[in-house]
A protein has these predicted regions:
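Short loop/turn segments immediately following the C-termini of beta-strands
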Residues: 48, 104, 162, 172, ...
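A short loop-to-beta-strand structural motif that recurs across blades of beta-propeller domains
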Residues: 51-54, 107-111, 118, 165-169, ...
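Residue-level detector of Asp-centered blade-edge/turn motifs that repeat once per structural unit
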Residues: 37-40, 93-96, 150-154, 208-211, ...
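Gly/Pro-rich loop segments of beta-rich domains
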Residues: 20-31, 44, 61-87, 117-144, ...
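Conserved beta-propeller blade signature
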Residues: 42-44, 98-100, 156-158, 213-215, ...
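Bacterial N-terminal signal peptides
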Residues: 7-15
Length: 342
């Protein structure tokens, strides 16, 4: 075969290959809900169903970092490996290099010193209630902390207090907690109003972009809200009715169904784990549109090795960006973590 013909065939072959493909980053997990990385490239995974935190080191070795696997609240002040957790939904490596864990059903946030391995409680008494604004977060009560975020300056820990229907923030310097969104009542907030005076449906997840905009994802509200630097709240995505529609168009005309997690990329786009539609979607604040990133919309486990729009997911509870800029998905009910490679 002439070299020119061979080159043409090879070029056609490359065109048929997916520009992106989905690979398995980690498996053998019990309902992974969240993942984050330290500066060295080690990954930490919150296993909601396993009541533990797993470590995936940069060499690819997987081990248990924290949690005995039994539900409970114990071990503060001691080794994280001997501590008990209860349904941890989220985690993040903080600006101080320590690992912060939303210990959801223990109604608190705990911190693991990654150098010493010691775990301590930084927010929440463990009691499910609402109290403590204006005082130390460690003495305050929360109604299930489902998600956490840090502000761009690394000064505040922002917490999603779902059953209290509030977003609360703790100063990392003073430890004092305050409400930044939600008045405790159930309902849809009015656009342009002070976020602290408005109701929320059920704030399930929170993220903060590089400008300090606080994004709130509502599970049963099927919507994404944004709190700007002035403290005003607006709905930016979702009709409020559950469904799967609107990809490629205005986000306010799109439907989501029980979304559970969100994160912001370097361009301040918002990734959304649209859990009950088994998809990952992206909201762009620049043009107000929403697009599908991964998932067919069908519950399943097929399609690994292929294009993101052909992979089947099963109730994903996490969507985030790894240090290289790749999208990583917590494919929870398939008990695995996926990575979209270019």
């Amino acid at each position: 075969m002439p070299s020119s013909a061979a080159a043409t065939l090879f070029a056609l072959f490359l065109m048929l290959l997916p520009a992106e493909k989905v690979t398995i980053l980690a498996g053998d997990l019990k309902e992974p809900f969240a993942i984050d990385w330290d500066k060295a490239g080690n990954a930490y995974i919150a296993e909601m169903g396993g009541n533990r935190i797993s470590l995936l080191d940069k060499a690819g070795k997987q081990s248990v970092l924290a949690g005995t696997g039994e539900k409970g609240l114990s071990g503060d002040g001691g080794a994280a490996a001997k501590a008990q957790f209860n349904g941890p939904h989220h985690l993040l490596v903080g600006p101080d290099g320590d690992l912060y864990v939303a210990d959801t059903f223990n109604n608190c946030v705990r911190k693991i010193d990654l150098k010493s391995g010691v775990v301590t409680r930084v927010a929440g008494t463990g009691k499910k209630a609402y109290s403590g604004d204006g005082g130390p977060a460690v003495s305050a009560d929360f109604g299930g902390i489902y998600c956490i975020a840090f502000d761009p300056k690394g000064e505040k820990l922002v917490m999603c207090d779902l059953d209290s229907r509030r977003i609360r923030a703790m100063s990392l310097k003073t430890g004092i907690v305050e409400t930044v969104a939600g008045n405790g009542q159930k309902g849809m907030p009015k656009n342009g109003e002070d976020a602290k005076t408005q109701p929320l449906v059920d704030p399930r997840a929170v993220a903060v972009d590089s400008k300090g905009t606080i994004y709130i994802l509502e599970r049963a509200g099927h919507a994404l809200r944004a709190v700007d630097a002035a403290g005003k709240i607006h709905t930016v995505a979702g009709t409020g009715k559950g469904g799967l529609s609107g990809d490629g168009g205005p986000a306010l005309q799109a439907q989501m169904n029980g979304p559970k997690h969100l994160s912001c990329d370097k361009e301040d786009n918002v990734l959304i784990a649209d859990t009950e539609t088994h998809t990952i979607r992206r909201y762009s604040p620049k043009d107000g549109k929403i697009t599908r990133v991964a998932g067919t919309g069908k519950k399943g486990s097929g399609g690994v090795g292929g294009a993101p729009d052909q992979v089947e997911l099963d109730r994903p509870h996490g969507a985030t960006i790894d240090p290289s800029g790749a999208i990583v998905i917590s494919d929870s009910e398939n008990h695995r973590v996926l990575r979209i490679e270019k």
